[in-house]
């Protein structure tokens, strides 16, 4: 693909040049080619976007629930019509296999938008009787202008997960995509405008997180920030949001999730789940189950089943329908993952497979890392303690249920957890003791629109998806009505 035209900001229904004068490049990680130069939003651009959003939000909030619902449904239709086009762009920008982006990224994002479009007319208040002459009623009102800050692993899906409930509740959103993968969020802005969204209700500001993101979190005109990213960055976003104007926040942060295989489990099922929990999207999924606990007596058999499945991984041309494994998203991220792999070797973990870059025709110029499985791991190893965010599985053994629950919870993270067992009683007993916000039994990874997702501990605050997320983009106004004569003591 030839280099794209320079990408601008999207403010008030159209493209506009950044006032900062700064740009950055976005790279195709499969081959290292530059996809596009992208303009970076500065402080003045954030001010412009907020002013635009304030104007648009008033128009949007004044529309009826059914009018807003119809517009968002039109956006859903356009997303589905352009699924393949958007998936190709997402593959170029992220490196993910087209077999994945064409069936997951836009599809699941559109599903979430459709879900919230349907919920808009059901967003209602309550009535509370006090006595015969007085009652209270409540209204759920939009917050105003909110900000979404996305991560680089699911660019358009995250933009939809954040914008869908925000817009459904009557807010305007300013979205800052990751500077690593900024392209599809700009396309989403075009689609919203085409669907009839008033100008300013969805503005997109590409830029460097440390600058553009900080300007958004500090801006007094922003009522809420929804952030997806790493724990350290999330803490900065939360601190800036609180210090500036006590903004509400939703944080979807990192994870080091446990996958527990019990001795009664079907090991073929367990191996299939472990593969999806570690190598889907080349391991760049925040909920990945990278700490795989297996009974000591099952370890050898489980390892053989994993090795057999690693042979089924197909890396290569990301547009080949048979490819199911792409490069990492960037060269700096590849180098970071390789440092973790080197650390695992240094600390005594045994490499079962992988452990290096992928080499050969088609791989040398890209950010490729081989699917890697470590075994003979211990809880104190760096690869077991820290989030790697790459195709690296760690296999650990255990002896008892109580032991594995304790060890699974021995982490600062609490995003996800899962178990594989044939015993339904054990499944619920163990899941209820695991300290994680998203849990799976005999499956892994699905996050449907109806399911609230978010983390415990350092893995986040608040939830995305589900009814409660729509409510989190509103504020409740309570009104007391008195029909009798008011009595004053003065």
Swiss-Prot record:
Its EC number is 1.2.1.8. One of its GO terms (cellular component) is cytosol. Keywords: Metal-binding, NAD, NADP, Oxidation, Oxidoreductase, Potassium, Stress response. It comes from the Bacteria. This is Betaine aldehyde dehydrogenase. K(+) 1 binds at residues 26-27, 93, 180. K(+) 2 binds at residues 246, 457, 460. The keyword Repeat does not apply. The lineage of its organism: Bacteria, Pseudomonadati, Pseudomonadota, Gammaproteobacteria, Enterobacterales. Induction: By osmotic stress. Choline is required for full expression. Oxygen and choline exert their control via the transacting DNA-binding proteins ArcA and BetI, respectively. Binds 2 potassium ions per subunit. Aldehydes with apolar groups are the most effective inhibitors. N-Methylated compounds are also inhibitory, but to a much lesser degree than the aldehydes. The alcohols are more inhibitory than the corresponding acids, and the inhibitory effect increases with the degree of methylation from ethanolamine to choline. The active site is at residues 162, 252, 286, 464. The modification Cysteine sulfenic acid (-SOH) is found at residue 286. Coiled coil: none annotated. It comes from Escherichia coli (strain K12). Its cofactor is K(+). CDD domains: ALDH_F9_TMBADH.
């Amino acid at each position: 693909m030839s280099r794209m035209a320079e990408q601008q900001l999207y403010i008030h229904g159209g493209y506009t040049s950044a006032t900062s004068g700064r740009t950055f490049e976005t790279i195709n990680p499969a081959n290292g080619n530059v996809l596009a130069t992208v303009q970076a939003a500065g402080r003045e651009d954030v001010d412009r976007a907020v002013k635009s959003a304030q104007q648009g939000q008033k128009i949007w909030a004044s529309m009826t629930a059914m009018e807003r619902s119809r517009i968002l449904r039109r956006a859903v239709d356009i997303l589905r019509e352009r699924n393949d086009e958007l998936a190709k762009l997402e593959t170029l920008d992220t490196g993910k296999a087209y077999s994945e982006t064409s069936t997951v990224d836009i599809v699941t994002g559109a599903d979430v938008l459709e879900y919230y479009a349907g919920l808009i007319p059901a967003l209602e208040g309550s009535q509370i009787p006090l006595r015969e002459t007085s009652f209270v009623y409540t209204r759920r009102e939009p917050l105003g202008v909110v900000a979404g800050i996305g991560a680089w692993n699911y660019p358009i899906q995250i933009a939809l997960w954040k914008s869908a409930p925000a817009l459904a509740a009557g807010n305007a959103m300013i979205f800052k995509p990751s500077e690593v993968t900024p392209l599809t969020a700009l396309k989403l802005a075009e689609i919203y405008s085409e669907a009839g969204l008033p100008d300013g209700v969805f503005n997109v500001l590409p830029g460097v997180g440390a600058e553009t993101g900080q300007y958004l979190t500090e801006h007094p005109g922003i009522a809420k920030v929804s952030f997806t990213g790493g724990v350290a960055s999330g803490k900065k976003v939360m601190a800036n949001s609180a210090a500036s104007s006590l903004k509400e926040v939703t944080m979807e942060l990192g994870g080091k999730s446990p996958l527990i295989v019990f001795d009664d489990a079907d090991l073929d099922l367990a191996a299939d789940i472990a593969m999806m929990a570690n190598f889907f999207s080349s391991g760049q999924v925040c909920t990945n189950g990278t700490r795989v606990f297996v009974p000591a007596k099952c370890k050898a058999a489980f390892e053989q089943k994993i090795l057999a499945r690693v042979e089924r991984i197909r890396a290569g041309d990301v547009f080949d329908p048979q490819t199911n494994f792409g490069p990492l998203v960037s060269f700096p991220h590849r180098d970071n993952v390789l440092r973790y792999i080197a650390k695992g070797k240094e600390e005594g973990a045994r490499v079962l497979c992988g452990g290096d870059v992928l080499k050969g025709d088609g791989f040398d110029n890209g950010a490729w890392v081989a699917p890697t499985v470590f075994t003979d791991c211990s809880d104190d190893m760096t690869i077991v303690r820290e989030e790697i965010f790459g195709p690296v599985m760690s296999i650990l053994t255990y002896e008892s249920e109580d032991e594995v629950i304790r060890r699974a919870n021995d982490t600062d993270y609490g995003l996800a957890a899962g178990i594989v067992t044939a015993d339904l009683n054990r499944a619920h007993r163990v899941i209820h003791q695991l300290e994680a916000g998203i849990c799976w039994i005999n499956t892994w990874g699905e996050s449907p629109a109806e399911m609230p997702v978010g983390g415990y501990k350092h893995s986040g605050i608040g939830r995305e998806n589900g009814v409660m997320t729509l409510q989190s983009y509103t504020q409740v106004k309570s009104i007391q009505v008195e029909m009798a004569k008011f009595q004053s003591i003065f």
